[in-house]
């Protein structure tokens, strides 16, 4: 496994290491043809292609083999942190000798700055930053600027503003053994890079001094570096074990990158401060002309305070709102983002593109609408608008080769792709489930008979309904009929959801009822029947895409079957049925031609990588505290657990704990409990980006 901290030497001799996949198996099924078609398409000049891969066909492995063939730095974007974490682990195992990095929002908790005009209430930005994820973000940008064999797995955070990569690279400090530099001179340079001196709490982004020895903990690294001086010359450098303090290796040279992505050289900071001050005075005059003296005073006081902090420390809270001044951009120009740290020629993989593309498209307008009231009421200068995510057009302009990956590509992907390459035949040779339509009248009685058949074969059943009330009533009915059944609803937290899946797999119950069973973690080999009630009703959960996705839940069992209960066959139903039957024909023909026999996927229950399954979650949703003091202690305990969960990449669990903390703060009127969930109605969920 590659060292996530990366080597320390600035020359990076391993920068020429080629991408090489290490997998326990060779491409199979449709994978060899898909890999060859995609690679040929790019080599022939295609800029955008789509990999249409059915559930369980090994799309991630196919993407990996394509990367190996193209030998290009690669950005992989997922639509939430949890999926990004899963992909990160998969790519790390497939590319053990290359730099596989992880770039998502570093917030455990995030309440965006906002102003609610109706109640004249200003809400300060409130955030809890996860230091480990911050380290991983810096590791990603460092790798992109110092080596070629890089894969970055990211959430939509990849399109949000980041510092100028040229400043980040040019301000980097190269230190070599034998170099003539005084100890105090090195300390001053580290401060310029926004490193903090801390002789007690020695963590990433800090340094400490012990006589003629300086120890620096790089922002991106897992190991601190000891620099020993002999007079005004560096005598020795070593990488240290962070716990024992013992020497891991001697280092001839070290390259320190800034501790903040928004780091700016002193001369440029002075120029930026003057430009900000000029714009502030213009904004004050604007408010005075319109008679809004409160806003005029507010923008002057707030901006002046920020300028004083920037002049003194080179940084201020909310410095991202001044990002346009800290680079060579003009107002309205696209912000610098993670994409600008990539070389000109790189591959972008958009995973689950039918969900990720709409998410990318929606970020810009959502961010702008929240800032309107802040700018209009003097809380921020208009240039705060330039601290924003990319528009979709800007995103498309900054990317080069693009590969959309989905079992159900959307209209955008199909329209933009030069080729839609299908991966229909699975390496396991399983075929898509058989589909039947049953009358909605008497659907529950029919379902009971089908459940009995599955129980007799020690198989499992998923049932999806349209409403919470119907799911509850059906669960109650099945229980009274003696069926071992559980119900998964929108309030089921992360750990409970995974425990439900685990219990279903172990046979603790036979049927799982839910409303939206498209979520990750529900690819269960033991499920041989998916029952879709009220399949002919219009709506998102009964669209062609959703139906195909739901049908795929039965695609990992050789006896897989889907039953649609409906009074009529809608266009969405027919399209989903036609597509599934088309895939079945292709899969069965392949099996007949090659003499292969499909078998149910065998996967030990313990092999399921369930975020949060091994985390102590006692009291997360336990008994309510009796008074404010108990509540405050519980919130403090929960906050520590939230940070631990996020550090372990268990983001859904961290989100559940965050929500419990909000409930306690509101119920007992603790600090931070009076902020609305999202005043502008547009802030992205922390676990999404």
Curated annotation (Swiss-Prot):
Pfam families hit by this protein: Helicase_C (PF00271), ResIII (PF04851), UVR (PF02151), UvrB (PF12344), UvrB_inter (PF17757)
Keyword ATP-binding: yes
Residue span, Helicase ATP-binding domain: 40-422
InterPro entries noted in UniProt: Helicase/UvrB_N (IPR006935), Helicase_ATP-bd (IPR014001), Helicase_C-like (IPR001650), P-loop_NTPase (IPR027417), UVR_dom (IPR001943), UVR_dom_sf (IPR036876), UvrB (IPR004807), UvrB_inter (IPR041471)
Cross-referenced PROSITE patterns: HELICASE_ATP_BIND_1, HELICASE_CTER, UVR
Single GO cellular component term: cytoplasm
Residue ranges annotated as motif Beta-hairpin: 106-129
Sorted UniProt keywords: ATP-binding, Cytoplasm, DNA damage, DNA excision, DNA repair, Excision nuclease, Nucleotide-binding, SOS response
SUPFAM superfamilies tied to this protein: C-terminal UvrC-binding domain of UvrB, P-loop containing nucleoside triphosphate hydrolases
Superkingdom of this protein's organism: Archaea
UVR domain sequence ranges: 632-667
CDD domains: DEXHc_UvrB, SF2_C_UvrB
Binding site for ATP: 53-60
Single Gene Ontology BP annotation: nucleotide-excision repair, DNA damage recognition
Disulfide topology: none
Chain positions covered by the region annotation Disordered: 1-26, 668-689
Domain Helicase C-terminal: 443-605
Location within or outside the cell: Cytoplasm
UniProt GO MF annotations: ATP binding; ATP hydrolysis activity; DNA binding; excinuclease ABC activity
Family listed: Belongs to the UvrB family.
Function: The UvrABC repair system catalyzes the recognition and processing of DNA lesions. A damage recognition complex composed of 2 UvrA and 2 UvrB subunits scans DNA for abnormalities. Upon binding of the UvrA(2)B(2) complex to a putative damaged site, the DNA wraps around one UvrB monomer. DNA wrap is dependent on ATP binding by UvrB and probably causes local melting of the DNA helix, facilitating insertion of UvrB beta-hairpin between the DNA strands. Then UvrB probes one DNA strand for the presence of a lesion.
UniProt comment concerning the protein's domains: The beta-hairpin motif is involved in DNA binding.
Assembly: Forms a heterotetramer with UvrA during the search for lesions. Interacts with UvrC in an incision complex.
The name this protein goes by in its record: UvrABC system protein B
Name of the gene this protein is made from: uvrB
């Amino acid at each position: 496994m590659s060292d996530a901290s990366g080597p320390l030497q600035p020359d990076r001799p391993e920068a020429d290491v080629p991408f090489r996949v290490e997998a326990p198996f060779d491409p199979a099924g449709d994978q060899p043809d898909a890999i060859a078609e995609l690679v040929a398409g790019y080599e022939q000049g295609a800029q955008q292609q789509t990999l249409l891969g059915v559930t369980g066909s090994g799309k991630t492995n196919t993407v990996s083999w394509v990367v190996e063939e193209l030998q290009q730095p690669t950005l992989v974007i997922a639509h939430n942190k949890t999926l990004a974490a899963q992909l990160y682990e998969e790519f790390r195992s497939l590319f053990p000798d290359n730099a596989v990095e992880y770039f998502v929002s570093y917030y455990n908790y995030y309440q965006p700055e906002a102003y609610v005009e109706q109640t004249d209430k200003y809400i300060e930005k409130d955030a809890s930053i996860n230091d480990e994820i911050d380290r991983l973000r810096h590791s990603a940008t460092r790798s992109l600027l110092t080596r070629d064999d890089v894969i970055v797995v990211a959430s939509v955070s990849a399109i949000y503003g980041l510092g100028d990569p040229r400043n980040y690279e040019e301000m980097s400090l190269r230190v070599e053994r034998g170099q003539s530099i005084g100890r105090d001179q090195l300390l001053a340079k580290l401060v310029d890079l926004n490193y903090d001196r801390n002789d007690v709490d020695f963590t990433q982004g800090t340094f400490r001094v012990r006589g003629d020895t300086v120890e620096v903990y790089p922002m991106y690294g897992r190991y601190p570096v000891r620099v020993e001086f002999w007079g005004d010359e560096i005598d020795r450098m070593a990488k240290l074990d962070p716990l024992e303090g013992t020497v891991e290796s001697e280092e001839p040279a070290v390259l320190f990158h800034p501790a903040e992505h928004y780091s700016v050289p002193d001369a440029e900071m002075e120029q930026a401060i003057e430009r900000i001050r000029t714009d502030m005075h213009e904004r004050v005059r604007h408010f005075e002309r319109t008679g809004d003296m409160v806003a005029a005073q507010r923008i002057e006081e707030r901006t002046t305070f920020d300028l004083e902090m920037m002049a003194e420390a080179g940084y201020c809270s909310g410095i991202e709102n001044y990002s346009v001044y800290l680079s060579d951009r003009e107002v309205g120009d696209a912000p610098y983002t993670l994409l600008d740290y990539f070389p000109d020629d790189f591959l972008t993989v958009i995973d689950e593109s039918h969900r990720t593309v709409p998410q990318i498209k929606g970020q810009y307008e959502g961010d702008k609408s929240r800032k309107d009231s802040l700018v209009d009421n003097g809380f921020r200068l208009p240039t705060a608008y330039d601290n924003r995510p990319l528009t979709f057009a800007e995103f498309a302009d900054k990317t080069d080769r693009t590969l959309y990956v989905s079992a159900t590509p959307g209209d955008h992907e199909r329209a933009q792709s030069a080729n839609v390459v299908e991966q229909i035949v699975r390496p396991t040779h399983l075929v898509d489930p058989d589909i039947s339509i049953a009358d909605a009248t008497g659907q529950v009685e029919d379902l009971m008979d089908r459940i009995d058949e599955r129980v007799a074969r020690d198989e499992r059943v998923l049932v999806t309904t349209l409403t919470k009330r119907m799911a509850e009533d059906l669960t109650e009915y099945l229980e009274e009929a003696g069926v071992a059944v559980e119900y998964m609803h929108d309030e089921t937290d992360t750990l409970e959801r995974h425990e439900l899946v685990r219990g279903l797999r172990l046979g603790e119950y036979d049927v799982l009822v839910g409303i939206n069973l498209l979520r990750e973690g529900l690819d269960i080999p033991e499920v041989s029947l998916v029952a879709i009630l009220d399949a002919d009703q219009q709506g998102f959960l009964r669209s062609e895409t959703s139906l195909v996705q739901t049908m795929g839940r039965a695609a990992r069992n050789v006896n897989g079957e889907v039953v649609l209960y409906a009074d009529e066959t809608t266009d969405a139903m027919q399209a989903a049925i036609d597509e599934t039957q088309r895939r079945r024909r292709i899969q069965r023909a392949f099996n007949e031609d090659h003499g292969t026999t499909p078998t149910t996927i065998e996967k030990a229950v313990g092999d399921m990588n369930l975020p949060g399954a091994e985390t102590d979650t006692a009291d997360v949703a336990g008994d309510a505290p009796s008074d404010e003091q108990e509540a405050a202690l519980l919130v403090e305990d929960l906050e520590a657990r939230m940070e631990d969960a996020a550090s372990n990449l268990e983001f859904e669990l961290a989100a559940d704990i965050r929500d419990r903390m909000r409930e306690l703060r509101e119920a007992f009127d603790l600090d931070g409990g009076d902020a609305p969930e999202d005043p502008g109605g547009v802030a992205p969920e922390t676990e999404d980006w």
